[in-house]
């Protein structure tokens, strides 16, 4: 970074402002382990104190909005871990720390390690939901990885005895606290995966401090849980306790007892469900039989209606009705045709054809005579019009003009010769006469002089 210096002369206020900007921009936020001294808590709610070690000290302030989140009351001489911003108090030129977070030194270091490991594993994808394996439903055999002397195992067994006493349980005893605990937990997970005896595992312990639960914040334990082929339920501490194992496990239970309830079946609930299903089945069977009985009654009635004797009687009645209808129809048909025949005879008697034939024959002869006369008149008029048209055509025909002694000349490219400027001496002309063509060459061109008329005044 380039320093904001120039060749000018600094004022004190500008110097302090520049130093403050350098401190804030270069250092940013830091974690600091130190001892508290000169702690004061005025009515404003802000905290003012000094952070020191055996060789140096620095002033610090923690504003009310930040210190309200601190879960303990700081004391002089107490070792703490703080996260702070380095700044400079410009009026006095004193640099100081603005504290944003404060924890007791022991738990604070562990919490810092917890956050760093959590960020690391999260970045690697160990917490992704896509890696979570579903729990078997129902579980056929349960594995429990915990201490045999702890309250967690006692709680799990009591819950299973009450809810699902028929569920087989395999206990993988391990230490859950101390330096050896992480390796024992890892070995128990690997052993359960090698034996394939159970289809779900509970890994957990009872409550305790952050340091007591630290085995379940071990990176090696987290990776062993992640690589397990058997689904794992994490059940560490109380509901407010959160460990790395909770994030990596396929399912997190707030307590060991809750984990036992999650992986087991409630036999009383199952019994109620079976009874409910039995009642529903009985009702369905009753409805089914009633429906079938109703269908049987309908079919029986239809069968009786389709008995051969009944069908034969209905067919006989139908045949009698059809025969009567046929007889009535024939009688009506004969009667109607008889009346029509009589009317036709009367019309034929009144309409003698010989007189009509004679009358129509006379009309045809008259029409034929009129038609012939009209055709002859039309032909005569057309001949007269044709003769007139021929005379007119001969009068306007170019050939008739040529017959009177005129001619038509064309240039060599076929254009009609109208003016002398269309040709030059030596051009060949084609001249049309009445009885043929003459080809000639232009020897001389003479233009007619225009006569100027004198102006009369």
Swiss-Prot record:
GO cellular component: cytoplasm; exodeoxyribonuclease VII complex
HAMAP family per the UniProt record, alphabetical: Exonuc_7_L (MF_00378)
Protein localization: Cytoplasm
Keyword Hydrolase appears in the UniProt entry: yes
Gene designation: xseA
Quaternary structure, from the entry: Heterooligomer composed of large and small subunits.
Gene Ontology MF: a single term: nucleic acid binding
EC supergroup of this enzyme: hydrolase
EC id: 3.1.11.6
Protein name: Exodeoxyribonuclease 7 large subunit
Function: Bidirectionally degrades single-stranded DNA into large acid-insoluble oligonucleotides, which are then degraded further into small acid-soluble oligonucleotides.
Catalytic reaction list: Exonucleolytic cleavage in either 5'- to 3'- or 3'- to 5'-direction to yield nucleoside 5'-phosphates
Primary location recorded for the protein, binned into one broad class: cytoplasm
One family name in Pfam for this protein: tRNA_anti_2
UniProt KW keywords: Cytoplasm, Exonuclease, Hydrolase, Nuclease
GO biological process terms on file: DNA catabolic process
Family named by the database record: Belongs to the XseA family.
